[in-house]
Amino acid sequence: MTAAVFFGCAFIAFGPALALYVFTIATEPLRIIFLIAGAFFWLVSLLISSLVWFMARVIIDNKDGPTQKYLLIFGAFVSVYIQEMFRFAYYKLLKKASEGLKSINPGETAPSMRLLAYVSGLGFGIMSGVFSFVNTLSDSLGPGTVGIHGDSPQFFLYSAFMTLVIILLHVFWGIVFFDGCEKKKWGILLIVLLTHLLVSAQTFISSYYGINLASAFIILVLMGTWAFLAAGGSCRSLKLCLLCQDKNFLLYNQRSR
Protein backbone atom coordinates (compact mmCIF):
# COMPACT_ATOMS: atom_id res chain seq x y z
CA MET A 1 0.00 0.00 0.00
CA THR A 2 2.79 2.42 0.87
CA ALA A 3 4.47 1.73 -2.50
CA ALA A 4 1.21 2.57 -4.27
CA VAL A 5 0.99 5.86 -2.36
CA PHE A 6 4.61 6.64 -3.16
CA PHE A 7 4.37 6.05 -6.91
CA GLY A 8 0.89 7.54 -7.19
CA CYS A 9 1.89 10.78 -5.48
CA ALA A 10 5.18 10.90 -7.40
CA PHE A 11 3.38 10.61 -10.74
CA ILE A 12 0.81 13.24 -9.72
CA ALA A 13 3.48 15.72 -8.65
CA PHE A 14 6.11 15.18 -11.33
CA GLY A 15 4.31 13.40 -14.17
CA PRO A 16 3.22 16.53 -16.09
CA ALA A 17 6.65 18.13 -15.65
CA LEU A 18 8.31 14.95 -16.92
CA ALA A 19 5.99 14.91 -19.93
CA LEU A 20 6.79 18.54 -20.72
CA TYR A 21 10.49 17.78 -20.50
CA VAL A 22 10.31 14.70 -22.71
CA PHE A 23 8.15 16.20 -25.46
CA THR A 24 9.39 19.80 -25.56
CA ILE A 25 12.93 19.93 -24.18
CA ALA A 26 14.75 16.59 -24.24
CA THR A 27 15.23 16.62 -28.02
CA GLU A 28 17.06 19.97 -28.01
CA PRO A 29 20.47 20.15 -26.24
CA LEU A 30 20.32 23.94 -25.98
CA ARG A 31 16.99 23.79 -24.16
CA ILE A 32 18.42 21.25 -21.72
CA ILE A 33 21.26 23.65 -20.93
CA PHE A 34 18.83 26.51 -20.30
CA LEU A 35 16.69 24.23 -18.13
CA ILE A 36 19.66 23.22 -15.99
CA ALA A 37 20.76 26.85 -15.73
CA GLY A 38 17.29 27.85 -14.54
CA ALA A 39 17.34 25.08 -11.95
CA PHE A 40 20.77 26.28 -10.82
CA PHE A 41 19.51 29.85 -10.39
CA TRP A 42 16.68 28.55 -8.23
CA LEU A 43 19.16 26.57 -6.14
CA VAL A 44 21.27 29.67 -5.56
CA SER A 45 18.17 31.61 -4.51
CA LEU A 46 17.35 28.82 -2.05
CA LEU A 47 20.89 28.95 -0.64
CA ILE A 48 20.69 32.69 -0.05
CA SER A 49 17.21 32.37 1.46
CA SER A 50 18.51 29.68 3.82
CA LEU A 51 21.39 31.91 4.91
CA VAL A 52 19.01 34.80 5.63
CA TRP A 53 16.67 32.54 7.61
CA PHE A 54 19.59 31.01 9.54
CA MET A 55 20.96 34.43 10.51
CA ALA A 56 17.51 35.60 11.60
CA ARG A 57 17.07 32.42 13.64
CA VAL A 58 20.40 32.95 15.39
CA ILE A 59 19.48 36.54 16.23
CA ILE A 60 16.17 35.62 17.90
CA ASP A 61 17.32 32.30 19.38
CA ASN A 62 15.58 31.04 22.54
CA LYS A 63 12.51 33.16 21.94
CA ASP A 64 8.93 32.00 22.53
CA GLY A 65 6.79 29.91 20.18
CA PRO A 66 4.91 32.73 18.38
CA THR A 67 8.21 34.38 17.52
CA GLN A 68 9.42 31.17 15.89
CA LYS A 69 6.19 31.02 13.88
CA TYR A 70 6.67 34.58 12.64
CA LEU A 71 10.25 33.70 11.76
CA LEU A 72 8.99 30.86 9.57
CA ILE A 73 6.57 33.20 7.80
CA PHE A 74 9.34 35.76 7.36
CA GLY A 75 11.61 33.10 5.87
CA ALA A 76 8.97 31.98 3.37
CA PHE A 77 8.27 35.52 2.18
CA VAL A 78 11.97 36.35 1.90
CA SER A 79 12.48 33.15 -0.09
CA VAL A 80 9.74 34.12 -2.56
CA TYR A 81 11.20 37.60 -3.00
CA ILE A 82 14.70 36.23 -3.60
CA GLN A 83 13.38 33.67 -6.09
CA GLU A 84 11.77 36.42 -8.14
CA MET A 85 14.95 38.48 -7.96
CA PHE A 86 16.88 35.54 -9.39
CA ARG A 87 14.23 35.05 -12.06
CA PHE A 88 14.86 38.64 -13.10
CA ALA A 89 18.63 38.09 -12.99
CA TYR A 90 18.24 35.03 -15.20
CA TYR A 91 16.16 37.04 -17.66
CA LYS A 92 18.88 39.71 -17.85
CA LEU A 93 21.51 37.03 -18.42
CA LEU A 94 19.51 35.39 -21.21
CA LYS A 95 18.83 38.77 -22.80
CA LYS A 96 22.51 39.67 -22.82
CA ALA A 97 23.42 36.25 -24.21
CA SER A 98 20.83 36.57 -26.98
CA GLU A 99 22.06 40.05 -27.93
CA GLY A 100 25.67 38.86 -27.88
CA LEU A 101 24.83 35.94 -30.17
CA LYS A 102 23.17 38.27 -32.66
CA SER A 103 26.15 40.66 -32.67
CA ILE A 104 28.69 37.85 -33.16
CA ASN A 105 26.71 35.96 -35.79
CA PRO A 106 23.88 38.06 -37.27
CA GLY A 107 22.78 35.17 -39.47
CA GLU A 108 22.21 32.86 -36.50
CA THR A 109 18.62 32.62 -35.27
CA ALA A 110 18.51 33.02 -31.49
CA PRO A 111 15.89 31.16 -29.42
CA SER A 112 12.84 33.30 -28.76
CA MET A 113 12.46 34.84 -25.31
CA ARG A 114 9.08 33.13 -25.02
CA LEU A 115 10.73 29.76 -25.45
CA LEU A 116 13.46 30.68 -22.96
CA ALA A 117 10.82 31.87 -20.49
CA TYR A 118 9.07 28.51 -20.70
CA VAL A 119 12.26 26.49 -20.33
CA SER A 120 13.60 28.56 -17.43
CA GLY A 121 10.22 28.46 -15.69
CA LEU A 122 10.15 24.68 -15.96
CA GLY A 123 13.66 24.55 -14.51
CA PHE A 124 12.57 26.71 -11.58
CA GLY A 125 9.45 24.60 -11.08
CA ILE A 126 11.09 21.18 -11.20
CA MET A 127 13.77 22.14 -8.69
CA SER A 128 11.21 23.81 -6.42
CA GLY A 129 8.98 20.74 -6.55
CA VAL A 130 11.85 18.36 -5.82
CA PHE A 131 12.98 20.27 -2.74
CA SER A 132 9.46 20.81 -1.40
CA PHE A 133 8.11 17.29 -1.85
CA VAL A 134 10.89 14.69 -1.89
CA ASN A 135 11.19 14.47 1.91
CA THR A 136 7.43 14.08 2.28
CA LEU A 137 7.40 11.54 -0.53
CA SER A 138 10.10 9.46 1.14
CA ASP A 139 8.01 9.31 4.34
CA SER A 140 5.15 7.74 2.39
CA LEU A 141 7.25 4.58 2.01
CA GLY A 142 7.25 4.03 5.78
CA PRO A 143 5.65 0.86 7.19
CA GLY A 144 1.90 1.41 7.35
CA THR A 145 2.22 5.18 7.00
CA VAL A 146 -1.18 6.92 6.94
CA GLY A 147 -0.47 10.43 8.12
CA ILE A 148 2.37 12.34 9.71
CA HIS A 149 2.04 13.21 13.41
CA GLY A 150 -1.74 12.85 13.38
CA ASP A 151 -2.32 14.69 10.10
CA SER A 152 -5.07 13.71 7.69
CA PRO A 153 -4.60 10.51 5.63
CA GLN A 154 -4.99 12.80 2.61
CA PHE A 155 -1.83 14.71 3.51
CA PHE A 156 0.35 12.99 0.90
CA LEU A 157 -2.25 13.40 -1.83
CA TYR A 158 -2.71 17.06 -0.96
CA SER A 159 1.06 17.64 -0.96
CA ALA A 160 1.35 15.95 -4.37
CA PHE A 161 -1.30 18.17 -5.94
CA MET A 162 0.19 21.30 -4.37
CA THR A 163 3.60 20.34 -5.75
CA LEU A 164 2.03 19.91 -9.19
CA VAL A 165 0.44 23.35 -8.90
CA ILE A 166 3.72 24.97 -7.84
CA ILE A 167 5.65 23.41 -10.73
CA LEU A 168 3.12 24.52 -13.35
CA LEU A 169 2.81 27.95 -11.75
CA HIS A 170 6.56 28.45 -12.05
CA VAL A 171 6.23 27.74 -15.78
CA PHE A 172 3.41 30.26 -16.12
CA TRP A 173 5.12 32.80 -13.85
CA GLY A 174 8.24 32.53 -15.99
CA ILE A 175 6.35 33.22 -19.22
CA VAL A 176 4.39 36.13 -17.76
CA PHE A 177 7.45 37.53 -15.96
CA PHE A 178 9.63 37.52 -19.08
CA ASP A 179 6.79 39.05 -21.10
CA GLY A 180 6.54 41.87 -18.57
CA CYS A 181 10.29 42.43 -18.76
CA GLU A 182 10.24 42.47 -22.56
CA LYS A 183 7.43 45.03 -22.63
CA LYS A 184 8.86 46.92 -19.62
CA LYS A 185 5.55 46.61 -17.79
CA TRP A 186 6.89 46.38 -14.26
CA GLY A 187 3.43 46.01 -12.76
CA ILE A 188 3.30 42.52 -14.25
CA LEU A 189 6.38 41.59 -12.25
CA LEU A 190 4.64 42.80 -9.11
CA ILE A 191 1.58 40.66 -9.88
CA VAL A 192 3.81 37.60 -10.31
CA LEU A 193 5.45 38.34 -6.96
CA LEU A 194 2.12 38.83 -5.19
CA THR A 195 0.56 35.65 -6.57
CA HIS A 196 3.71 33.75 -5.60
CA LEU A 197 3.43 35.15 -2.08
CA LEU A 198 -0.27 34.25 -1.95
CA VAL A 199 0.30 30.63 -2.95
CA SER A 200 3.17 30.31 -0.48
CA ALA A 201 1.08 31.83 2.31
CA GLN A 202 -1.53 29.11 1.82
CA THR A 203 0.91 26.55 3.18
CA PHE A 204 0.50 28.10 6.63
CA ILE A 205 -3.16 27.05 6.70
CA SER A 206 -2.50 23.63 5.20
CA SER A 207 -5.10 21.93 7.42
CA TYR A 208 -7.83 23.36 5.15
CA TYR A 209 -6.97 21.10 2.24
CA GLY A 210 -10.05 21.72 0.13
CA ILE A 211 -9.89 25.51 0.35
CA ASN A 212 -6.16 25.59 -0.34
CA LEU A 213 -6.33 23.35 -3.38
CA ALA A 214 -9.35 25.13 -4.83
CA SER A 215 -7.77 28.57 -4.49
CA ALA A 216 -4.41 27.31 -5.79
CA PHE A 217 -6.03 25.77 -8.87
CA ILE A 218 -7.98 28.98 -9.52
CA ILE A 219 -4.71 30.93 -9.50
CA LEU A 220 -3.18 28.23 -11.72
CA VAL A 221 -5.95 28.52 -14.32
CA LEU A 222 -5.80 32.32 -14.32
CA MET A 223 -2.01 32.43 -14.64
CA GLY A 224 -2.10 29.68 -17.27
CA THR A 225 -4.58 31.65 -19.37
CA TRP A 226 -2.46 34.78 -19.00
CA ALA A 227 0.71 32.90 -19.95
CA PHE A 228 -1.03 31.38 -22.98
CA LEU A 229 -2.04 34.82 -24.24
CA ALA A 230 1.37 36.32 -23.42
CA ALA A 231 3.04 33.55 -25.44
CA GLY A 232 1.01 34.56 -28.49
CA GLY A 233 -1.80 32.08 -28.13
CA SER A 234 -5.35 32.59 -29.36
CA CYS A 235 -8.52 30.56 -29.76
CA ARG A 236 -7.59 29.84 -33.36
CA SER A 237 -4.05 28.71 -32.54
CA LEU A 238 -5.37 26.55 -29.70
CA LYS A 239 -7.82 24.89 -32.06
CA LEU A 240 -5.09 24.25 -34.63
CA CYS A 241 -2.86 22.81 -31.92
CA LEU A 242 -5.54 20.46 -30.59
CA LEU A 243 -6.27 19.30 -34.13
CA CYS A 244 -2.51 18.86 -34.80
CA GLN A 245 -2.73 21.23 -37.78
CA ASP A 246 -0.08 23.75 -36.68
CA LYS A 247 3.43 22.33 -36.37
CA ASN A 248 4.88 25.71 -35.39
CA PHE A 249 2.47 26.32 -32.53
CA LEU A 250 4.02 28.44 -29.75
CA LEU A 251 7.00 26.58 -28.29
CA TYR A 252 8.08 24.90 -31.50
CA ASN A 253 8.35 28.17 -33.34
CA GLN A 254 12.04 29.01 -33.28
CA ARG A 255 11.71 32.47 -34.76
CA SER A 256 12.80 35.22 -32.42
CA ARG A 257 9.81 37.24 -31.24
Curated annotation (Swiss-Prot):
Belongs to the APH-1 family. Its main location: membrane. Probable subunit of the gamma-secretase complex, an endoprotease complex that catalyzes the intramembrane cleavage of integral proteins such as Notch receptors and APP (amyloid-beta precursor protein). It probably represents a stabilizing cofactor for the presenilin homodimer that promotes the formation of a stable complex. Probably present in a minority of gamma-secretase complexes compared to APH1A. Keywords: Membrane, Notch signaling pathway, Transmembrane, Transmembrane helix. The keyword Transferase does not apply. This is Gamma-secretase subunit APH-1B. GO terms for cellular component: endoplasmic reticulum; endoplasmic reticulum membrane; endosome membrane; gamma-secretase complex; Golgi membrane; membrane; plasma membrane; transport vesicle. It is found in: Membrane. One of its GO terms (molecular function) is endopeptidase activator activity. Weakly or not expressed in leukocytes, lung, placenta, small intestine, liver, kidney, spleen thymus, colon, skeletal muscle, heart and brain.
